[in-house]
Regions:
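Signature for phosphate-centric chemistry
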Residues: 2-17, 21-219, 223-265
Length: 265
């Protein structure tokens, strides 16, 4: 509608840049997108490393770290739970934890019978911040997120909602609660301002260069939900919740769109 490209356009390499992290799923997603975006053009999907090797531009790892950085990062993360701190973050997820555990029949699971995991009741989340590594955590939020990820994928892939929930009758609100765990996990690890600016810096630098590249009309960067979480936090994007989605922050297939307009005005 804006006249950026004509129908059946075949843009030059300078006009379009399709750049993916070198993970297999990112390369595939970029190819699928490009086929639909410019179906008659032979557009190269650029990635820099052998498949399944993380590209530093998309790798949300801590590039600089110090004791003062750790202290401030942990404070900012704890502030997400209000006066109750880290424990408060988990307490606010109590209902979501219970729905997820019930859906998985966690108390009757092999993990529980082996004494490994019977409930998501370890609220003392441990945050691990190391130079050159992604922010990590230990505790129930981590365990529940692993389960939430799997269930949400199943929700999208399985047409039968009851089958997706292992025979349980889950409401849309129940699924939203399960998905909320993943959203909170992303915020805790990547959305604290001091952490977001740190881990998103390589990608933000690349984005800045793309927005200022001579002759560039369109750039498509294909990464991960952690990239969206850190970039939006680093740019101080106002809080939002997506409508008509059980995932309110970074659903599968979500995109951040940045437009640059130039003219006499």
């Amino acid at each position: 509608d804006a006249g950026l490209f004509k129908e059946n356009a075949n843009p030059t390499k300078d006009e379009v840049n399709i750049y993916a992290n070198s993970m297999q799923r990112c390369i595939a997603t970029a190819r699928y997108f490009t086929t639909a975006f410019l179906p008659v053009a032979d557009i190269q999907v650029n990635h820099r490393y052998v498949p399944s090797k993380m590209d530093p531009v998309f790798f949300p790892r801590l590039t600089k770290i110090s004791e003062s950085f750790k202290k401030e990062a942990l404070k900012q993360i704890a502030d997400m739970g209000g006066k109750r701190g880290i424990r408060g973050i988990n307490e606010d997820l109590k209902k979501a934890y219970e729905i997820t555990a019930s859906t998985l029949d966690l108390k009757d699971s092999p993990a529980c019978k082996e004494g490994k995991l019977c409930a998501f009741d370890n609220y003392n989340t441990e945050i691990l911040l190391e130079r050159g590594e992604e922010p990590r955590m230990k505790g129930s939020l981590k365990d529940a997120t692993t389960c939430s990820d799997a269930l949400i994928l199943q929700y999208y892939e399985e047409p039968d909602a009851k089958k997706a929930a292992f025979g349980h009758d889950l409401s849309l609100e129940d699924w939203t609660q399960i998905a909320r765990i993943k959203d909170v996990y992303g915020d805790v690890l990547f959305a604290a301002p001091i952490v977001a600016v740190n881990v998103a810096h390589p990608l933000l630098t690349y984005m800045y260069d793309e927005l200022n590249a001579k002759g560039r009309k369109f750039s498509f960067l294909c990464g991960h939900d952690s990239n969206i979480a850190s970039v939006t936090a680093a740019l101080d994007v106002e809080p939002y919740e997506l409508p008509n989605s059980i995932e309110k922050k970074t659903p599968i297939g979500s995109k951040v769109v940045i437009e640059k307009f130039e003219g006499k005005d």
